[in-house]
Amino acid sequence: MWVRQVPWSFTWAVLQLSWQSGWLLEVPNGPWRSLTFYPAWLTVSEGANATFTCSLSNWSEDLMLNWNRLSPSNQTEKQAAFCNGLSQPVQDARFQIIQLPNRHDFHMNILDTRRNDSGIYLCGAISLHPKAKIEESPGAELVVTERILETSTRYPSPSPKPEGRFQGMVIGIMSALVGIPVLLLLAWALAVFCSTSMSEARGAGSKDDTLKEEPSAAPVPSVAYEELDFQGREKTPELPTACVHTEYATIVFTEGLGASAMGRRGSADGLQGPRPPRHEDGHCSWPL
């Protein structure tokens, strides 16, 4: 009932004020009321990447996002811009703006930072419709320190070159310790084999030479046995001769004659009396 009693003139006045001040229409489209840029302090080493985040409560395609840097004279220098869904570096391609999937946050990256990148950075939003308006976030400072060399305090490990040299030295020593005995063993086996082969060859050669030289070195005397004449005659069997029958006559003398005769016979045949018959005379009987 009370609403019906509100005069239309008052309602119209409120709408006009809201339109002029942007309380109802321009505020939803104005991102600068919730524009943030963090972290407020960022320290990185030279060569690393630095990342800031710019957040907007409401984003529309009519807005343009700028990434600025304050100069020593407190003037803003544009580094990159994001418009129509694209990152547009101004001078240095190391400055990039990436829109996150939630479409309200933007990562502003500096790749491969340098010492002269240190300074104060901020982001700014520009609204072109219905009126051109610019709003900037508070500044955040970036400090780029000297390049940090990798040390072995946290993860102690020898440098690659000494390690490689040490490993090479160990491998060389082990190879020498293993290779030298193997070479000596092979040399010894080869020497034994060669000496055995040479001795066998010499033994076989000496045997062959002995067999070849034996007929001439120790000749066997050969004697030609010839039969002598007298040996031939002795060996020739004589045929038994025919027995010659000899007749003897006995002469009887007187005593004187007999004595002389006997004396003569004795002188002829000896003192032993008449000679007995010999075997060579055959089977001759004494003469009658």
Curated annotation (Swiss-Prot):
There is a cross-link at residue 235 (Glycyl lysine isopeptide (Lys-Gly) (interchain with G-Cter in ubiquitin)). Ubiquitinated at Lys-235 by the SCF(FBXO38) complex, leading to its proteasomal degradation. Ubiquitinated via 'Lys-48'-linked polyubiquitin chains. Deubiquitinated and thus stabilized by USP5. The keyword Nucleotide-binding does not apply. A motif (ITSM motif) lies at residues 247-251. A motif (ITIM motif) lies at residues 223-228. Residues 1-24 form the signal peptide. Disulfide bonds join 54-123. GO terms for molecular function: signaling receptor activity. The modification Phosphotyrosine is found at residues 225, 248. The chain crosses the membrane at residues 170-190. Thymus-specific. One of its GO terms (cellular component) is external side of plasma membrane. Residues 31-139 form the Ig-like V-type domain. Inhibitory receptor on antigen activated T-cells that plays a critical role in induction and maintenance of immune tolerance to self. Delivers inhibitory signals upon binding to ligands, such as CD274/PDCD1L1 and CD273/PDCD1LG2. Following T-cell receptor (TCR) engagement, PDCD1 associates with CD3-TCR in the immunological synapse and directly inhibits T-cell activation. This is Programmed cell death protein 1. It comes from Mus musculus.
